[in-house]
C-alpha cells in the first residue's frame, strides 16, 4: 500500500533545501504522496523550546555553518553559506504554496516551495519581493499573476496558522520534518531512515 508523507518546511531553511531533491526522489521511487506544509517556525520555535538563528549562541551558529559546508560538499549542492536575502519574508511565498496545494495539488505546491528555497540558497534572490516571486512562479510553468492573486486571499494565512498548530500538536519542532503516519523524522540527515520506512510499505 502506498504511503503518505506530510512534509513540514520552512521556506528559509537550508536544511529543507539540502533534502529537497531527495524527498521528491524517494516519494516517486516508492509511490508515496508528498504533501507540503510551509508552517510558521517563528511560532513553533518558542512553543517547543527552540531558538531562531540570531538568538543561538556563537558556538551553535559556528557549528551550523560548518555542518552546512560539510553537507554542501557531500551532496554537491552549491548553496551559498551566507545568502544575501536570508531570512526572506515567508508570508507571501507560503500563501502561494498553500493556495496551490489546496487548489492545484501537492506536486505543484512542492515544486514551487523548492523553487523558492533554491532562489534563496543558490541564486541570492529575495522571494519576499512579489516581483521576484512572480518570476520564480513563472519558471514553474504557472501564471504568476493568477497565483499571486489567488494567494492574496486571507484564507491561506489563516490556513497556515491552522497548519502550524497542527504541526505542534503532532510533535513538529524543526525543519524539515517528514511524517509518515505518527512517525516523525526530523532533518534531512534522517532521510535514510525515511527511505527505509517507505521501503517497508
Roles of regions detected by a PLM:
Residues 3-6, 12-32, 111, 115-201:
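C-terminal cap of thioredoxin/glutaredoxin-like
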Amino acid at each position: 500500500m502506498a504511503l503518505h508523507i506530510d512534509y513540514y518546511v520552512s521556506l528559509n531553511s537550508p536544511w529543507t533545501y539540502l533534502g529537497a531533491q531527495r524527498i521528491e526522489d524517494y516519494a516517486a521511487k516508492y509511490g508515496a504522496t508528498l504533501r507540503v506544509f510551509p508552517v510558521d517556525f517563528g511560532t513553533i520555535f518558542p512553543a517547543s523550546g527552540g531558538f531562531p538563528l540570531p538568538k543561538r549562541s556563537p558556538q551553535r551558529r559556528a557549528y551550523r555553518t560548518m555542518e552546512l559546508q560539510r553537507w554542501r560538499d557531500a551532496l554537491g549542492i552549491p548553496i551559498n553559506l551566507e545568502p544575501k536575502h536570508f531570512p526572506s519574508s515567508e508570508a507571501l511565498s507560503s500563501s502561494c504554496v498553500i493556495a496551490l496545494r489546496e487548489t492545484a495539488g501537492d506536486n505543484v505546491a512542492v515544486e514551487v516551495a523548492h523553487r523558492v528555497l533554491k532562489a534563496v540558497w543558490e541564486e541570492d534572490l529575495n522571494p519576499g519581493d512579489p516581483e521576484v516571486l512572480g518570476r520564480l512562479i513563472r519558471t514553474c510553468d504557472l501564471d504568476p499573476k493568477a497565483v499571486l492573486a489567488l494567494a492574496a486571499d486571507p484564507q491561506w494565512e489563516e490556513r497556515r496558522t491552522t497548519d502550524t498548530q497542527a504541526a505542534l500538536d503532532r510533535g513538529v519542532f524543526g525543519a524539515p520534518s517528514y511524517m509518515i503516519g505518527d512517525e516523525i523524522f526530523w532533518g534531512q540527515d534522517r532521510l535514510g531512515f525515511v527511505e527505509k520506512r517507505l521501503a517497508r510499505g
